[in-house]
């Protein structure tokens, strides 16, 4: 996100029992992301589209503001989305009022429907820094998937580690459509033991020198090494797990890439 080692992470929200609401995306964060990254990157969109057929039922958990879901709808696919953030889903509905999306904790999403294809783009699975919750989440994805279907997702790797900072600094400063100044200040700390990248941020909206609104975000990501997830995915029932290092589906061989792309089926 925002060109400071966040470029891979899509703007989505998770909660799943985290009472401090870490990684919850509020209105200022949503507005900044929509200005900077309104559309899905073409190569990434093409990668996720490559798994589709028009007769598929598709689910995008953590769908955010719809950078991927809306282009899928525009191409005629039967797709549904889930996200916790009402701010993000409001943006999505502005783009596609008839989109089938649900504001929900995915672990509490109650449905009998199974899907042919489930995808989570842009490294958003890395937002789960509690590995117990992450495993529950992945198990839920397997439960929602039809036999023979595909579950495809991306995670950030240890190559995305940021240098530690002692103080907050201005990382992004942009103008809104009202010509207000929207500023992000952040700092970084990496926990070697847990592979957690902590990047707390402060979003501020100014009209001249007047502070109109401030929003604090406890942004955290888990940075993966190759081999960290594969065994668990097999343990929960996926019989085929392939790991790529690029949208061209090059097989991952080491940690010298900023993302891993997982293709799972059973």
Where are these regions (language model features)?
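Conserved class I S-adenosyl-L-methionine
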Residues: 12-64
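Class I SAM-dependent methyltransferase SAM/SAH-binding core
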Residues: 66-108
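A short acidic, Gly/Pro-enriched loop at the edge of an enzyme's catalytic core
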Residues: 110-118
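A short beta-strand submotif of the Rossmann-like class I SAM-dependent methyltransferase core
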Residues: 120-122
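A short glycine-rich, Lys/Arg-flanked "PGG" loop and its adjoining helix->strand segment in the class I
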Residues: 135-147
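SAM-dependent methyltransferase
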Residues: 152-227
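C-terminal lobe and adjacent flexible extensions of AdoMet/dcAdoMet transferase-like proteins
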Residues: 220-266
């Amino acid at each position: 996100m925002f060109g400071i080692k966040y470029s891979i992470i899509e703007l989505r929200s998770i909660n799943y029992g985290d009472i401090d609401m870490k990684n919850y995306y509020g209105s200022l964060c949503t507005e900044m992301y929509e200005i900077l990254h309104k559309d899905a990157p073409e190569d990434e969109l093409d990668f996720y589209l490559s798994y589709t057929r028009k007769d598929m039922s598709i689910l995008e958990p953590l769908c955010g503001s719809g950078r991927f879901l809306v282009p899928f709808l525009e191409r005629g696919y039967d797709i549904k989305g889930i996200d916790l953030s009402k701010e993000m889903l409001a943006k999505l509905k502005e783009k596609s009022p008839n989109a089938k999306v649900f504001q929900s904790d995915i672990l509490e999403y109650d449905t009998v429907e199974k899907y042919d294809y489930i995808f989570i783009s842009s490294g958003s699975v890395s937002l789960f820094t509690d590995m117990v919750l992450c495993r529950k989440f992945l198990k839920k994805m397997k439960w929602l998937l039809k036999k023979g279907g595909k579950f495809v997702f991306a995670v950030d790797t240890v190559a995305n580690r940021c240098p530690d900072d002692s103080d907050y600094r201005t990382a992004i400063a942009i103008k809104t459509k009202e010509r207000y100044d929207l500023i992000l200040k952040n700092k970084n700390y990496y926990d070697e033991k847990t592979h957690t990248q902590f990047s707390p941020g402060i979003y501020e909206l100014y009209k001249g020198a007047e502070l109109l609104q401030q929003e604090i975000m406890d942004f955290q990501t888990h940075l993966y090494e190759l081999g960290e997830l594969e065994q668990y995915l097999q343990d929960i029932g996926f019989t085929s797990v392939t790991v790529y290092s690029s949208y061209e589906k090059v097989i991952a061989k080491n940690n010298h890439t900023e993302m891993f792309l997982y293709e799972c089926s059973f």
